[in-house]
Amino acid sequence: MSAVFNNATLSGLVQASTYSQTLQNVAHYQPQLNFMEKYWAAWYSYMNNDVLATGLMFFLLHEFMYFFRCLPWFIIDQIPYFRRWKLQPTKIPSAKEQLYCLKSVLLSHFLVEAIPIWTFHPMCEKLGITVEVPFPSLKTMALEIGLFFVLEDTWHYWAHRLFHYGVFYKYIHKQHHRYAAPFGLSAEYAHPAETLSLGFGTVGMPILYVMYTGKLHLFTLCVWITLRLFQAVDSHSGYDFPWSLNKIMPFWAGAEHHDLHHHYFIGNYASSFRWWDYCLDTESGPEAKASREERMKKRAENNAQKKTN
């Protein structure tokens, strides 16, 4: 029996042989639930197996949201009008490159990412990640997701930076740098070891959070993973528009930040924000290099002046 309702009698009342009938029953017995909560409760009640319900939902969510976000960038790449905002306008991915990348990404999704996704619910039960309705408040979810963005960005910066050293780059991260001019679909084109290690930032940070607080809702995780997927695809899109988020939030990394990383193969290691690269002087690109050289020049002049005095 599903744990979506903390009431065995209610769980029995809403169950039906079809999903649509289950949804009607949920709406009848729980009219106070909002639109999403009713569909959520009906899904878990209809499946009547939380392990299967969570596994299937997470897998389909990941596939749909990833390719749903990749599709607009694929279309934009075919329209010359948008080249004015392309960061590397002479490097448009060919159909052959897109197809090769698609095959590799699908292989990764089904052979690498599917196993942890399908075995995730038992861990949820042990950690206290709940599927019950109603959902947490919007304020609670927003604060938690904001924290996850900050924590994931921190993990990503240090893990990504490690992947640019020696054997880690040669045998693992080099695969992701096959494309010096990234495109949306290439966001998850990576070695399995990189997929799992960098993916820990997305899933592992919420796990650490719930281990500390003892409370987290699975719907919050769904929203977080969706936003993280959108961020990853957008940062690999290769386009920087006047309305891009980094124009509104200067500390947001965006496509321009990550495109420089792929172009120069070094620096700009963070995923969502710019502060780690700024504070640790790992910003990439001509402007960052010029600024770094200017600071070094001034430092040398100051040291020379001190010695003279």
Curated annotation (Swiss-Prot):
Belongs to the sterol desaturase family. Residues 147-282 form the Fatty acid hydroxylase domain. PANTHER family: STEROL DESATURASE. The third module or late pathway involves the ergosterol synthesis itself through consecutive reactions that mainly occur in the endoplasmic reticulum (ER) membrane. One of its GO terms (biological process) is ergosterol biosynthetic process. Its main location: endoplasmic reticulum. There is a cross-link at residue 96 (Glycyl lysine isopeptide (Lys-Gly) (interchain with G-Cter in ubiquitin)). Its cofactor is Fe cation. Keywords: Endoplasmic reticulum, Iron, Isopeptide bond, Lipid biosynthesis, Lipid metabolism, Membrane, NAD, Oxidoreductase, Steroid biosynthesis, Steroid metabolism, Sterol biosynthesis, Sterol metabolism, Transmembrane, Transmembrane helix, Ubl conjugation. The chain crosses the membrane at residues 56-76. The histidine box domains may contain the active site and/or be involved in metal ion binding. Disruption phenotype: Affects mitochondrial activities and leads to an increase in intermediate sterols and a corresponding decrease in zymosterol and ergosterol production. One of its GO terms (molecular function) is iron ion binding. The gene is ERG25. Residues 289-301 have a biased composition (Basic and acidic residues). Residues 287-309 are annotated as: Disordered. This is C-4 methylsterol oxidase ERG25. It is a single-pass membrane protein. A motif (Histidine box-1) lies at residues 160-164. It is an enzyme of class 1 (oxidoreductase). It comes from Saccharomyces cerevisiae (strain ATCC 204508 / S288c) (Baker's yeast). It comes from the Eukaryota. Pathway: Steroid biosynthesis; zymosterol biosynthesis; zymosterol from lanosterol: step 3/6; Steroid metabolism; ergosterol biosynthesis. Pfam families: FA_hydroxylase. Present with 77100 molecules/cell in log phase SD medium. A motif (Histidine box-3) lies at residues 257-263.
